[in-house]
Amino acid sequence: MLYLYDSITIVSRLQEEFWKVMGSDYLPEMEQNGMRLLGMFMMGIHYNENLALWELDDWATLDRIQELQDKHPLMKAWQREAVDYITDFTGKVLQPAPFSPTLAKLKKGDYKSTIYLHTLAKVHPGKEDEYMEAVGKELKPMARRWGMKLVGCYKAVAGTASSGEVINIWTAGNIHGEWVKIRAKSLKDPAYKKWEIEAGKWRPKVVYRFLYGLVPYSPLRTPFLQEPAAPEEVRTVAMPEVEWK
């Protein structure tokens, strides 16, 4: 499996309209051609920044999607339409850890959450696989005790992003009060204190951000949105800066 990580900056007042248009005009064509939406999120701290995370079977699928976007008239029309909504866009290709759940597994399990925790670790060159293995063996079971589930663990493919990027995404509760309790449990856990010391040898820097699952057609989303949901059911919430240290 491969994953496509699209960071999209949207005109703030048009964000919900963009979600609707993307769901009707872009998503069906992509999924028909093998690019499956795993999650569409609003990102804190910049609230008009969105993350679209896609799952693909292999590099051949990615090549086919690229050719489709370059040549297909419908995709050309979408690109012209998207200019009205998007002010910036960056993408990168991710490779999953062996234990990272696939979309099929996520759909079968209980991974819906209003809040997800996104961590971006800057790992020393050549240590990405070693760090991800430690996440799977040590941090994943630890976090589950606190009430978090791993949604994905990925490393960025060289040439598509800064070197040494490892991204983890976790469920983090349905209200901010639940996150506060999760964080409190982690800070009292001696195993987590040990992990932070140990993890420092792999990653000198890690950035934490909240993701908000507020898009009705996203497989990863708040359980308070039923499927299918009307566009007016999508609503923003107050979002503080994430802190976990």
Regions found by a protein language model. Name each.
Residues 1-5:
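Extreme N-terminal starter segment of soluble prokaryotic enzymes
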Residues 6, 48, 86, 117, ...:
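Compositionally biased, intrinsically disordered low-complexity regions enriched in proline and serine
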